[in-house]
Amino acid sequence: MAAQFGNYVDYSGAKAPGSATHVRDPRLQILAATIPQIFANKHILDIGCNAGSVSIQLSLDFHAASVTGVDIDPKLIAQAEKLLALRASRATPPTSCSAPVVDYFPMSAVLTHGYRIEPHNKPARTPSAASAAWPYVTFFSADWVLPSDQDATDSYHVILALSVIKWIHLEHRDVGLTTFFAKCSSSLKPGGYLVIELQTWDSYQKAIRPNHAPHFQETLKELQLRPETSFDSLLANHGLHLCASSDALPRRINVYQKA
């Protein structure tokens, strides 16, 4: 089935065998091992959050101070809200003396007694202030590339763009990708990190197949920027410099730091 924006349900990159929403994402584990404390007590933006698994893990498993997840598809944000309610309902909240214990209550407890923390019924369409209540995760639906009255500078310690750059590039072309990188830079605090999961040019070509996103065929012909050769210099122009990378997974993960 073709996808309008590349936002396949439950798609946020190649999945590890046997992976599930409560199993720590290997990309996050690699990042935490490469740059210790990259997530703990940090304010994080997850762009293209899909159904919310990564955003929620950042809070529950990697102890972020707050996480904001944004996706262009409100249906995926609704799924993310339900997953957040489920995972938060299975955990013990943090106390002044201890961190939360995730997956403490069995699924049967939720099935029998319902959510301890109810999901939001209507996905937000604008970013609100970071949630003041545990688990400190906020979701909203928007095309983050586009300017908004809610945009703020120096807001985040970390911005994640996992398995989403290709779709931003195809949707908004070279000029939109440049705008996206500039907005990432302005949204990061000094010393903050932009994390990109690179999608190679051949994956762009595969994306326009009839059963994927054929409506991007003409757009692809217009693109001059290439992920393998153009991104580092383009990001450097916006004050974001490559500081770490990993080829441990099928897709390279690059980390850029704001000067």
Where are these regions (language model features)?
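Conserved beta-strand signature within the Rossmann-like core of class I S-adenosyl-L-methionine
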Residues: 190-198
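A short acidic, Gly/Pro-enriched loop at the edge of an enzyme's catalytic core
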Residues: 149-159
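Conserved SAM-binding loop
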Residues: 80-81
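Conserved class I S-adenosyl-L-methionine
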Residues: 42-50
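Conserved SAM-binding loop of SAM-dependent methyltransferases across substrates and taxa
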Residues: 51-63
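S-adenosyl-L-methionine
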Residues: 86-148
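A short glycine-rich, Lys/Arg-flanked "PGG" loop and its adjoining helix->strand segment in the class I
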Residues: 178-190
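Conserved alpha-helix/loop element of class I SAM-dependent methyltransferases that forms part
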Residues: 21-42, 57
